[in-house]
């Protein structure tokens, strides 16, 4: 049965120390956790990987006034300071002063990066660029302006075009600005995220987005296969999977070992083995797990010296 693709939702509960736990604190309270991130891709733990407060939300996509359809008066979310929470389950952009937020599944994220500000100052030269696939909720919050008609435009030209909205998230304060919160900070503390202002905040968020996006990489692949794969091409699809670059996913979902492959007996420098059997490809290897702060030493011996 085809799974329904998650879409953006309106969040009514703001993440706090009562319902989420920062990643560094999670590692301290879970001694059984050994760095295998695959255990974090479930609903048992809501873990905070990154984010920040006092952010300025903008949009690069031409949009009309942002509002919810069930509100009588349109309200621009950019007028209010926003908080960003990058969780293992989703992304939440919380609109302070409005009492709600935007919950974004990772399957809706098309692109994320850091963008240099043309008018930046020292310690505040970057902002987060987040490209999202449009859905009903994003259409309510960011109503796209109708494109101008063109004689070359047609239904075929837009058949495979993904409708998207580009958001910018800019820190309000630089790394070097002296700022005191009105309330005691319990989530984005120095112990958990460092200074987490200005450019440091942008870099921290991009790293957190990369980790969490890779956590949900398999979910996106499964949805794409169920939606687009032709049953008659199942065998060809299985062959293609063997040639797919998995990126960081193998490291996050598997044990911390070196991944390698090859033929077994090549330690004797045999030219026949090298040129005929392996043909210059990967040769003998083994999977080894190294623990932290341990010195490593090794030697490769030929058969004549054994």
Swiss-Prot record:
Coiled-coil region list: none
Entry-linked InterPro entries: ICln/Lot5/Saf5
Locations listed in the record: Cytoplasm; Nucleus
Alphabetized UniProt keyword annotations: Cytoplasm, Nucleus
Any single biological process term in GO: mRNA cis splicing, via spliceosome
Domain of life per record: Eukaryota
UniProt xrefs under Pfam families: Voldacs
Inducing stimuli: By cold.
GO cellular component, one term: spliceosomal complex
Record-stated family: Belongs to the LOT5 family.
PANTHER family documented for this protein: CHLORIDE CONDUCTANCE REGULATORY PROTEIN ICLN, METHYLOSOME SUBUNIT PICLN
UniProt miscellaneous comment: Present with 5930 molecules/cell in log phase SD medium.
Record protein name field: Protein LOT5
Organism of provenance: Saccharomyces cerevisiae (strain ATCC 204508 / S288c) (Baker's yeast)
Gene: LOT5
């Amino acid at each position: 049965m085809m799974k329904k693709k998650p879409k953006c939702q309106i969040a009514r509960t703001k993440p706090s120390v009562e319902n989420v736990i920062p990643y560094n604190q999670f590692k301290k309270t879970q001694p059984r956790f050994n760095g295998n991130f695959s255990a974090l891709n479930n609903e048992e733990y809501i873990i905070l990987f990154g984010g920040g407060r006092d952010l300025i939300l903008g949009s690069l996509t031409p949009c009309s006034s942002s509002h919810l359809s069930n509100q009588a008066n349109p309200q621009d979310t950019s007028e209010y300071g926003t908080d960003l929470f990058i969780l293992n389950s989703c992304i939440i952009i919380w609109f302070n002063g409005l009492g709600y937020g935007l919950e974004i599944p990772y399957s809706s994220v098309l692109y994320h990066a850091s963008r240099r500000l043309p008018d930046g100052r020292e310690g505040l030269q970057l902002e987060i660029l987040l490209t999202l696939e449009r859905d009903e909720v994003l259409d309510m919050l960011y109503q796209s302006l109708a494109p101008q008609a063109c004689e070359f435009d047609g239904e075929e030209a837009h058949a495979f075009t993904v409708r998207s909205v580009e958001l910018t998230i800019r820190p309000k304060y630089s790394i070097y600005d002296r700022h005191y919160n009105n309330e005691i900070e319990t989530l984005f503390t120095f112990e958990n995220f460092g200074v987490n202002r200005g450019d440091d905040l942008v870099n921290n968020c991009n790293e957190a987005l990369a980790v969490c996006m890779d956590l949900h990489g398999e979910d996106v692949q499964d949805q794409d296969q169920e939606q687009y794969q032709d049953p008659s091409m199942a065998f060809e699809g299985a062959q293609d999977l063997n040639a797919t670059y998995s990126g960081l996913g193998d490291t996050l979902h598997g044990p911390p070992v070196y991944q390698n492959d090859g033929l077994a007996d090549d330690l004797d420098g045999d030219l026949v083995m090298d040129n005929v059997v392996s043909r210059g490809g990967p040769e003998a290897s083994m999977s080894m797990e190294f623990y932290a702060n341990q010195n490593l030493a090794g030697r490769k011996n030929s058969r004549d010296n054994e």
